[in-house]
A protein has these predicted regions:
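Peripheral (often C-terminal) accessory segments that flank ATP-dependent C-N-forming ligase machineries
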Residues: 100-212
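A general structural signal for well-ordered alpha-helical segments in protein cores
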Residues: 11, 42, 95, 155-158
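Short, flexible active-site loops
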Residues: 22-32, 74-87
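Internal nucleotide-binding/catalytic subdomain
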Residues: 1-60, 64-66
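Active-site "cap" helix and flanking loop/linker of ATP-utilizing ligase/carboxylase catalytic domains
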Residues: 39-60, 66, 76-125, 130
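Conserved protein kinase catalytic/activation segment
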Residues: 68-70
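Short, acidic Gly/Pro/Ser/Thr-rich loop/turn segments
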Residues: 7-10, 19-21, 80, 126, ...
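Generic beta-structure capping elements
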Residues: 14-17, 75-78, 147
Length: 212
C-alpha cells in the first residue's frame, strides 16, 4: 500500500508470498486466498498507516494461521521485495508511488495489468559461473531484472524475474519449466531445483542453485 501526506491511500493487489529458510522465494499476484482475508489485510494495513501518520510505500506482511486468522508478521516502511511485481504488472510501480507520495504528487494507479509470479534470483545460482540468461529469456512471458551486485553469495538477492500470463496457472507453469518439477528435464544451464509442495494454497520451492 501507499499513503500520501493528506491521508489518501492506494492499495496494490494482495500478494501471496512463499518463503524458504526465511527468504522470499516467490510471490503470486493476485493472491490465492479468500476475498474476506484480503479485505481484512487491507483494513489492517490502513489502520497501521493512519496510526503512524505514515507517508510513502508500506509493506505489511501477515501469516495465516491454521484457523484462517491473519497475524501481522512484519512491516517494511519502504518499497519491498514482494512488491517488485509492480514494475511490470501494474500501471505504476511501487517505486513510482514512493516518489509521488514523498513529493506531494497525486498517487498513481495501482491496477494490476496481468496476473504475475515474481521469483527471486539468489546468489546460489552463481555457485559455479554466471547463469545462462539466454536459456531463461527464451520464455516470452518473462522479464528479467538484475541488481548489478558484484559479489554473489548463497541466499543473497541478486535479481528477480516477473512472469506475466493470462492466469496464475500459466505463470506457474513457466516457473515450473524454469525450475524443473521432477517429471521433465530441467532447463539446460539454469539448474533450477525440483518444486516441493507444502500445506497451504500453493507450492513452496527449494532454494535456487547452479547445476553441476
Amino acid at each position: 500500500m501507499v499513503r500520501a501526506a493528506d491521508g489518501m491511500m492506494a492499495f496494490y493487489p494482495v500478494v501471496e508470498n512463499r518463503h524458504h529458510q526465511g527468504i522470499l522465494d516467490f510471490s503470486v499476484v493476485p493472491a490465492r486466498c479468500a476475498e474476506s482475508l484480503q479485505n481484512q489485510a487491507r483494513r489492517c494495513a490502513a489502520r497501521i498507516a493512519d496510526a503512524l501518520d505514515y507517508v510513502g510505500v508500506l509493506a505489511v506482511e501477515f501469516f495465516v494461521d491454521g484457523a484462517g486468522r491473519l497475524l501481522v508478521s512484519e512491516m517494511a516502511p519502504r518499497p519491498h521485495n514482494s512488491g517488485h511485481f509492480t514494475i511490470d504488472a501494474c500501471v505504476h510501480s511501487q517505486f513510482d508511488q514512493q516518489v509521488r507520495a514523498l513529493c506531494g504528487l497525486p498517487l498513481g494507479e495501482t491496477r494490476l495489468l496481468s496476473p504475475v509470479v515474481m521469483m527471486n534470483l539468489l546468489g546460489d545460482l552463481w555457485e559455479n559461473d554466471e547463469p545462462d540468461w539466454s536459456t531463461l529469456l527464451r520464455h516470452p512471458q518473462l522479464k528479467l531484472h538484475l541488481y548489478g551486485k558484484k559479489v554473489a553469495r548463497p541466499g543473497r538477492k541478486m535479481g528477480h524475474v516477473n512472469v506475466l500470463a493470462p492466469d496464475i496457472r500459466q505463470a506457474m507453469a513457466v516457473l515450473d519449466a524454469l525450475r524443473g518439477d521432477g517429471h521433465r528435464p530441467r532447463e539446460a544451464g539454469m539448474g533450477f531445483p525440483d518444486a516441493e509442495h507444502s500445506a497451504g494454497c500453493g507450492p513452496s520451492c527449494k532454494p535456487l542453485r547452479q547445476s553441476q
